[in-house]
Structures are given as structure tokens and as C-alpha cells.
């Protein structure tokens, strides 16, 4: 809880080095002015630590495009149960020498070593984010839509499924928000550069709509 320092932000190399007690949101706040972000986005990002994210290989809605924590850590410093200090990984995106101990430690939930420092890989912030909400009268059509959407060239940045139980909770607070016969809903998000979203053929929006089941 005392290891809460952001050691360095290096936009030229798309890297931020932090101690494990730094909050996920603090990393986002520190890197956003440089035009970057750290993609892991668990629902607890406002109050979960980077060390906790690494220990569980946390992910969130954007894992569909960006993956989980394991894809966004370049290197670690840690102390093993025997009291040995180890350094894994490297400072660069391309690291092909030796055993990939970094990925081994990520998701180990503290059973292999205690993390003391993490070198995180940053990603450029998308300049445009767009969203579509789709309602379905049956689960099979919704499942078919998910398969079709994931086959598009423009991968969605988030794809969330809400079943009838979730929709009933929404109706309890906002009775007129959803069509009466809706039993499933998809919340679809795409991101990227303005040119990518506007001029890709077909556009992400048209591509998504074209892959929706006719029912």
C-alpha cells in the first residue's frame, strides 16, 4: 500500500514504469496528457491497483479488442518466496530472449513472487469512439450476431451482452427505455482514428448492421 509511485512516463517508447500500489485510474490520468492509455479496464479500475491487475491478469469490456493485463506488461521486478530479487522481461515491445517469466508471473495471484515494480506497455488513445445498441427478440439471434460481428475486419473495442435478467433490472428503473419484446441486448463499441471509422469500406456501423440476423 506504500508502493504507490509512478516512477516514469516515457511516451517516446510507449512505456510507463510504476510501483504495484498505483491505481489503474492513476496510470490512465498520468498517460492521457501524452495521448496514451493502459488498456486493461476492469470494472474496479477506479480503485484497483496495478499490482492487483497483474496478479489476476485483469480485463474488462475492452478485452475483446485489447486483451487482458497479460498483453500489456513488458517487464516486472519481484521478490520470490526464497527472498531472491528477480527482474523479468525488458523495456521494449520486442523481447524474444530467454524464458517469458513476465507472462508466467502475471495471473499467478502472488503464489510465485511479490511484484515490486512493473513496466507497462501503453497504447495510443483512439481519436474517435462510436457505439451501437442492438435489441433482440430471441437469444439465438443475439448469439448469431456476436459470431458475425467478430468476423468483421474492424474488430469492436467492446461487446457486452445483457440477458433478460439484466434487462429486467433496467426496466425496473427505466420502464420505457427498452422495446417491450426485447429479451437480449448487445452494446457494441468501435474505436480508432477518424479516417478509419469514417472511410473504411464498409464502415464499422454499416458492417455491424449488415451482419445482424434478419430476425
Predicted region positions:
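FAD-binding subdomain of flavoenzyme oxidoreductases
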Residues: 5-160
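Short basic, glycine-rich beta-strand/loop surfaces that mediate nucleic-acid
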Residues: 1
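Short glycine/threonine-rich loop-to-helix capping motif typified by GTGT followed
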Residues: 168-179
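Short acidic (Asp/Glu) and glycine-rich catalytic loops that position anionic groups and cofactors
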Residues: 122-128, 180-187
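Conserved small/polar residues in nucleotide/adenosyl-binding loops
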Residues: 199-206
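Active-site beta-loop-alpha junctions enriched in small/polar residues
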Residues: 162-164
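Hydrophobic alpha-helical segments, chiefly the membrane-spanning helices
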Residues: 210-215
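A conserved active-site cap/scaffold subdomain adjacent to cofactor or substrate pockets
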Residues: 182-198
Amino acid at each position: 500500500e506504500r508502493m504507490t509511485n509512478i516512477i516514469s512516463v516515457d511516451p517516446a517508447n510507449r512505456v510507463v514504469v510504476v510501483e504495484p500500489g498505483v491505481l489503474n485510474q492513476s496510470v490512465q490520468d498520468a498517460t492521457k496528457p501524452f495521448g496514451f492509455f493502459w488498456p486493461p479496464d476492469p470494472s474496479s479500475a477506479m480503485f484497483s491497483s496495478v499490482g492487483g491487475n497483474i496478479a489476476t491478469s485483469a480485463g474488462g469490456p475492452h478485452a475483446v479488442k485489447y486483451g487482458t493485463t497479460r498483453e500489456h506488461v513488458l517487464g516486472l521486478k519481484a521478490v520470490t518466496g526464497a527472498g531472491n530479487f528477480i527482474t523479468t522481461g525488458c523495456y521494449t515491445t520486442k523481447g524474444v530472449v530467454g524464458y517469458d517469466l513476465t507472462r508466467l508471473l502475471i495471473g499467478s495471484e502472488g503464489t510465485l513472487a511479490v511484484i515490486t515494480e512493473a513496466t507497462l506497455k501503453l497504447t495510443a488513445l483512439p481519436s474517435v469512439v462510436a457505439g451501437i445498441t442492438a435489441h433482440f427478440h430471441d437469444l439465438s439471434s443475439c448469439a448469431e450476431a456476436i459470431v458475425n460481428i467478430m468476423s468483421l475486419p474492424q474488430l469492436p473495442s467492446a461487446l457486452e451482452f445483457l440477458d433478460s435478467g439484466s434487462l429486467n433490472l433496467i426496466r425496473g428503473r427505466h420502464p420505457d427505455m427498452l422495446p417491450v419484446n426485447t429479451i437480449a441486448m448487445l452494446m457494441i463499441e468501435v474505436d480508432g482514428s477518424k479516417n478509419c471509422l469514417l472511410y473504411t469500406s464498409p464502415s464499422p456501423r454499416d458492417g455491424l448492421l449488415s451482419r445482424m440476423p434478419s430476425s
